[in-house]
Amino acid sequence: MSMNKGPTLLDGDLPEQENVLQRVLQLPVVSGTCECFQKTYNSTKEAHPLVASVCNAYEKGVQGASNLAAWSMEPVVRRLSTQFTAANELACRGLDHLEEKIPALQYPPEKIASELKGTISTRLRSARNSISVPIASTSDKVLGATLAGCELALGMAKETAEYAANTRVGRLASGGADLALGSIEKVVEYLLPPDKVESAPSSGRQKTQKAPKAKPSLLRRVSTLANTLSRHTMQTTARALKRGHSLAMWIPGVAPLSSLAQWGASAAMQVVSRRQSEVRVPWLHNLAASKDENHEDQTDTEGEETDEEEEEEESEAEENVLREVTALPTPLGFLGGVVHTVQKTLQNTISAVTWAPAAVLGTVGRILHLTPAQAVSSTKGRAMSLSDALKGVTDNVVDTVVHYVPLPRLSLMEPESEFQDIDNPPAEVERKGSGSRPASPESTARPGQPRAACAVRGLSAPSCPDLDDKTETSARPGLLAMPREKPARRVSDSFFRPSVMEPILGRTQYSQLRKKS
């Protein structure tokens, strides 16, 4: 209750006094700014419930602090009321003076922003005009003076050329050039007679050229001579290439190579034409498919048909080249065509060279990204199994050849074989007696055979299982040898035991090789 008594007393003491804070808050600029801050605060507060709870807590804290400050400052305000009144009056007078000097304080923020924008744009426009107008006028003057100087120089050059041509020396020089050019034309006509097909259009062209002007100019004659020489050179080159190609096609094996070269050139042109497109994995599949199709078509077609098609293509290319050459009536056009062709070739080469590394890297990267780890591991496992199978087949073939072919020191024949005792097993007493012996005389009589067998088996197997079995039986004399059961007959026994010969490898290793293969 004491907190609300202070303002009521102040209002009772000064009922008609204006407050500076209220006037400042009522200004459009300040009120608009406060509204903007209030909207921002409300939107932030409504963004999340946690933020709203925190803001409410701070609001309550600030309200409590302000109430406490007002309650504590109430005695001071009562004692200094006269001083506060005087300061308020002075502040109100200053605010009135500011409103008179700056009327924009009474404008809304939107109006102030529009007026400020218009003022800035007009200032910038005036500054730009002040800079660009003198530059434009100066450049126009400079260009006019330059054009006038160029026209004057051209006029002087023309007058000088006409004067030099009308002099005696000029007439002699032009006559000498005309005589030399005429002699060159006669030599060219004598050495290079025109074709029958091209004689009619060339004569018609000469008639059309001679009709408007009796004597052609020197430049036109030079251009005609250059076109004639270039056309004859290209015709001669095309004929020589055609003759060489026809002769080379008679050589056996050249036709497939030429077709393969044409396919490679077409594929390279396709790659160069697609240099701006993205590098994708299906591009490789398309190239492979087109390669297979072209290869099948080429193998199906006969040699005569390919020769006829190539001759037709070459004739069409020659006609196109001749048309391009005849379409250039002046040396400027001929040189321009040559320069254009060279420039286009250089551009294609440079673009292909710059695109090739990026294409290769992009293709490799896409293949690596598109290939999963499981596919890589499965492919690797299949490759390893295939290599093991091939190795097993190779070892089996080598062992079979060594077994059947009577090579010196390689084919080992053991009459007392493991397979020989299957039908007639020995008695138990004989087994005991044989088990008490340290070693059999046959095994000691030929000590070099196991080494040779191991040497032969080193091509396929890392160890000698038969030798290990014999050493183990000799090293254990005390064990009782039980009669072995007769194994079941299999189809492969006829392959591994053609006679009493013992196979080089053991049965376990042969079974492993069969499983691998």
Curated annotation (Swiss-Prot):
GO terms for biological process: cellular response to cold; lipid catabolic process; negative regulation of lipid catabolic process. Keywords: Endoplasmic reticulum, Lipid droplet, Lipid metabolism, Phosphoprotein. It is found in: Endoplasmic reticulum; Lipid droplet. Residues 483-492 have a biased composition (Basic and acidic residues). The modification Phosphoserine is found at residues 81, 126, 130, 132, 137, 174, 315, 385, 387, 411, 434, 436, 440, 460, 492, 494. InterPro entries: Perilipin, PLIN1. It comes from the Eukaryota. Transmembrane segments: none annotated. Disulfide bonds: none annotated. Major cAMP-dependent protein kinase substrate in adipocytes, also dephosphorylated by PP1. When phosphorylated, may be maximally sensitive to HSL. When unphosphorylated, may play a role in the inhibition of lipolysis, by acting as a barrier in lipid droplet. The N-terminus is blocked. Residues 299-319 have a biased composition (Acidic residues). One of its GO terms (cellular component) is endoplasmic reticulum. Residues 291-322 are annotated as: Required for interaction with CIDEC. Adipocytes. Residues 197-217, 285-321, 415-495 are annotated as: Disordered. Coiled coil: none annotated. Modulator of adipocyte lipid metabolism. Coats lipid storage droplets to protect them from breakdown by hormone-sensitive lipase (HSL). Its absence may result in leanness. Plays a role in unilocular lipid droplet formation by activating CIDEC. Their interaction promotes lipid droplet enlargement and directional net neutral lipid transfer. May modulate lipolysis and triglyceride levels. Belongs to the perilipin family. This is Perilipin-1. It comes from Rattus norvegicus. The lineage of its organism: Eukaryota, Metazoa, Chordata, Craniata, Vertebrata. The gene is Plin1.
